[in-house]
Amino acid sequence: MSSPAQPAVPAPLANLKIQHTKIFINNEWHDSVSSKKFPVLNPATEEVICHVEEGDKADVDKAVKAARQAFQIGSPWRTMDASERGRLLNKLADLMERDRLLLATMESMNAGKVFAHAYLLDVEISIKALQYFAGWADKIHGQTIPSDGNIFTYTRREPIGVCGQIIPWNGPLIIFTWKLGPALSCGNTVVVKPAEQTPLTALHMASLIKEAGFPPGVVNIVPGYGPTAGGAISSHMDIDKVSFTGSTEVGKLIKEAAGKSNLKRVTLELGGKSPCIVFADADLDSAVEFAHQGVFFHQGQICVAASRLFVEESIYDEFVRRSVERAKKYILGNPLNSGINQGPQIDKEQHNKILGLIESGKKEGAKLECGGGRWGNKGFFVQPTVFSNVTDEMRIAKEEIFGPVQQIMKFKSMDDVIKRANNTTYGLAAGVFTKDLDKAITVSSALQAGMVWVNCYLAVPVQCPFGGFKMSGNGRELGEHGLYEYTELKTVAMQISQKNS
């Protein structure tokens, strides 16, 4: 069976004008309390796209008050039929489809995503996430429980309340919908802080949320910096839950702030150093391509990046040769331009961090097969880089690089590679490539990771739970489990005169 044809990709919008740069509270646009603004850059050109209102604690306080008011008993949102919440989410998905070209252009310009990927993948995945959680809205059920004695007992899954949602810069639109969808499906209200590098699609989504008909205060969006706006959300005494996607370092700060404030519920999707294991019996062409995409997609700026590639000894040299050949095919440049398949890193800080880790690989004795430096004179570009002869103690084998850098290591036995793969503080994802079913089941069961792919990589269906073991986070996004992260489970027990079966 042939796979369905991909839709044609139109040209990006020319001369895109940014309409929404203010803080969104109570379905209205606000200047920041401080009157401060911050610049938003195009990482391919280093030029300022626009200036956005800089929210801080005072603005977060305003947003939380609006969200709390919208969550009051008897409010339009609390009394709304669950099916109507689902209809509103589907309406929002329809508006995203209408504005697909605008959203994709904005995501490519602001986040450095290759335009075709933004159009075909980012916007599509975001729409599907909203549609999936829209379907759940009137299917969130409690249970009746046959308890002992003349007691009638049942459970309710209730919305938690006001939820803070802190969005990363590497998937601004996708993660926005992954968090917004389940929160609203369950009946919560939200205060969203997009990453300071990439606030534009979130602010456009605010206009669509109002257009879709969500009541005022249900969704509030406060752009700003992590230590100020993000810190205010994490430590706020009237926010009931915080969900964060980003680095493990910042995740620890958020969990600490949540504990020191009101012990708010916390969901964290954090860093990774994901192993990808290729056995000698694997389909070599397929394994090379999946492993390549697993670390080079979106310039390596993905939390599940296959950044520790273990290849069985007997096929190691050939695998390295093919991987280098594949990496050399990239055409770098402005991701809005046709024919480009690698864009820039998000900002100067990330760009310099990646180049520093590449230098550490050279100094520590890894063999640089290709790339290894900056590309071009303008924009935050890094050459596609492949290292061979990498050993486990090197920094490039231990630290999250978040860039287009592939580390290829050699292994001899299954037992050996399982131990090495698990020898990390992270546990987000892993990949296994083999035609042997016994190997596939044994290794996937042994790996300490929240998502294990077998003979594929980067497949993250919205219907399935996604999240990490160990220091890669707490809780899950997506799927039924991701939905329940936005509910409190209440037991109601009432005395009755006589119980009957």
UniProtKB/Swiss-Prot annotation:
Enzyme Commission number(s) of this protein: 1.2.1.3
Position of the signal peptide: none
Source organism, top-level taxon: Eukaryota
Phosphoserine modifications at: 413
Residue numbers binding NAD(+): 246-251
GO biological process terms, semicolon-separated: ethanol catabolic process; fructose catabolic process
Modification N-acetylserine occurs at: 2
Record site: Transition state stabilizer: 170
PTM-bearing positions, type N6-acetyllysine: 91, 128, 252, 353, 367, 410, 419, 435
Note: Xenopus embryos injected with Aldh1a7 mRNA failed to produce retinoic acid in contrast to embryos injected with Aldh1a1.
Summary of subunit composition and partner proteins: Homotetramer.
The name this protein goes by in its record: Aldehyde dehydrogenase, cytosolic 1
Species per Swiss-Prot/TrEMBL record: Mus musculus
